[in-house]
Amino acid sequence: MTLNIQRQAPEQSEIMVANNTVANTQQKRLSIGIVGGGIGGVAFAVALSRDSHLDVQLFEAAPQFSEIGAGVSFGPNAVKAIQRLGLEASYQRIADSSPAPFEDVWFEWRRGSDDAYLTASLAPGVGQSSVHRADFLDAIVGNLPEGIAHFGKRCVEVKQDADSATAYFDDGTHFTGDVIIGFDGIKSAVRR
């Protein structure tokens, strides 16, 4: 069974050729399948879906978005990546962070015997912050365009040839695209 994904019509552009005539060309959108609807997969899908030259589809094994676990702290580079993905507002709404005047402190070292201050690692502009995994996933899912998330799609195999890659799901459907990207966890079918 084939998963029918509706794709937008290709963009058209005009090109001037040598004899001053105008030729219409169609630009093919790169088709991307993302397997895994956790924080990484959803964040990447949100970021890629902002590019009009990409047709992004997200496949999640669960019947809905859900995340387990507790709090997670993001280091300075992770917070900068969140900013570059355009998810900073979603992150800041739910993140706990250090209050002034310690907002740039990432980590502080103290002596165990008397709690005397030793040193600190600074991360100007990002500091130390943390979120609950489920809250962060809920916040970034709100940025995901309608119609690109598909649930109940547990990937069991990926095959590729010179022109495309195909993800096969345990419900008998499959998705063929230009690229398949795996965010499907430790038992990744994409990685195999």
Residue ranges of predicted features:
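Beta1/beta-strand and adjacent pyrophosphate-binding region of the FAD-binding site
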Residues: 23-40
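Short hydrophobic core segments
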Residues: 35, 155, 175-186
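Conserved Rossmann-like nucleotide-cofactor binding loop
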Residues: 40, 64, 187
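Generic structural signal for small/hydrophobic residues in well-ordered secondary structure
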Residues: 43-45, 60, 82, 140, ...
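Glycine-rich FAD pyrophosphate-binding loop
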Residues: 49-70
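Active-site-adjacent segment of FAD-dependent monooxygenases/related oxidoreductases
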Residues: 68-143
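A conserved short coil-to-beta-strand element within the FAD-binding core of flavoproteins
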Residues: 151-165
